[in-house]
From Swiss-Prot:
Its job: Catalyzes the conversion of dethiobiotin (DTB) to biotin by the insertion of a sulfur atom into dethiobiotin via a radical-based mechanism.
Protein species of origin: Francisella tularensis subsp. mediasiatica (strain FSC147)
Top-level taxon of the source organism: Bacteria
Keyword Nuclease applies: no
EC main group: transferase
The protein's Enzyme Commission number: 2.8.1.6
Similarity field: Belongs to the radical SAM superfamily. Biotin synthase family.
HAMAP family, alphabetized: BioB
Binding locations of [2Fe-2S] cluster: 90, 121, 181, 256
GO biological process, one term: biotin biosynthetic process
Protein name: Biotin synthase
């Protein structure tokens, strides 16, 4: 696949693009929606300078900071997520690298969440090959490490971590036989070509991502992008076309509509489902920002006749 071929797919008429994406989607997945829950297990004071992130220690934001939560409180959240219908429990920690003093505790938490009957996913920053192997042994199913944007636009967003470092972490994850969860953020001021190049980078990863989070910018006051923009710099039709293009390129990946969904109308979300989305974060909160409410999600899924994984088990 080349950049020009990706452009040609995206440039098709919207209805034609959605129809092809829907056919591919139904062939590989059918009518089910994967429900995942996300918990911030360590919040704030991150040494990275990601311009979109309220957890960066470089910016003055109003988030509540906390060190690594204790195991019991995390397990209680995981149990609640399972009872609410989530299939996967995702845990995020605002680190550049996981500290050695916290590694064993995180591994133990992964094991105990797995023992609850949930799939496990973590995002802990960069990890080396040995750490990836140990996380696999602990029972980790997925490791999330987003590329965020194209290689070309990346220096405009982050300067404290090189793009190639992200690729190396994904390589370590794949070599440990952990499923790769990797996507990006739209609406940060990037060009269309940057979005196409992000897709090309995802296609060229050391292992094909099994899960692709598609985020739209949530402008948070105090962050450089939050002070620059009042909303994500992408309209609904561009988002839907990007999702449909992603579905065509990644027929067997779960596409997750992630950050920014709470700002989308039910009609826009419906178009996203038609274009290939088959996974959402379920619960009223993401890491530090609000998510679409559970009541709203239940209403929309019922209205569309979509079934969650929990209902199909």
């Amino acid at each position: 696949m080349t950049l020009q071929q990706i452009k040609e797919i995206y440039s098709r008429p919207l209805t034609e693009l959605i129809l092809q994406a829907l056919e591919i989607h139904n062939k590989n997945f059918g009518n089910d929606i994967e429900l995942c829950s996300l918990k911030s297990i360590k919040t704030g004071t991150c040494p990275e300078d990601c311009k979109y992130c309220p957890q960066s220690g470089h910016y003055n934001t109003s988030i509540e900071k906390h060190k690594l939560l204790d195991k019991d409180s995390i397990l209680a959240e995981a149990k609640n997520a399972k009872d609410a219908g989530s299939k996967r429990f995702c845990m995020g920690a605002a680190w550049k690298h996981i500290p050695k003093k916290d590694f064993d505790q995180v591994a133990e938490i992964i094991t105990e969440v797995k023992n609850l009957g949930l799939e496990t996913c973590v995002t802990l920053g960069s990890i080396n090959a040995d750490e990836a192997t140990k996380l696999k042994q602990a029972g980790l199913d997925y490791y999330n490490h987003n590329l965020d944007t194209s290689r070309e636009f990346y220096p405009e967003i982050i300067t404290t971590r090189k793009f190639e470092e992200r690729i190396e972490t994904i390589r370590n994850v794949a070599n440990a036989d952990i499923n790769v969860c990797c996507g990006g953020i739209l609406g940060m001021g990037e060009s269309l070509d940057d979005r196409f190049n992000l897709l090309l980078e995802l296609l060229q990863l050391p292992a094909a991502p099994k899960s692709i989070p598609i985020n739209t910018l949530i402008p948070v006051k105090g962050t450089p992008l939050g002070d620059k923009y009042t909303n994500a710099q992408i309209d609904s039709f561009e988002l839907v076309k990007f999702i449909a293009t992603t579905r065509i390129l990644f027929p067997q990946a779960r596409l997750r509509l992630s950050a920014g969904r709470e700002n989308m109308s039910l009609e826009t979300q419906t178009l996203c489902f038609l274009a290939g989305i088959n996974s959402i974060f379920y619960g009223n909160k993401l890491l530090t920002e609000n998510n679409a409410t559970v009541n709203s999600d239940n209403f929309l899924l019922a209205k569309l006749g979509l079934k969650s994984n929990a209902e199909l088990c």
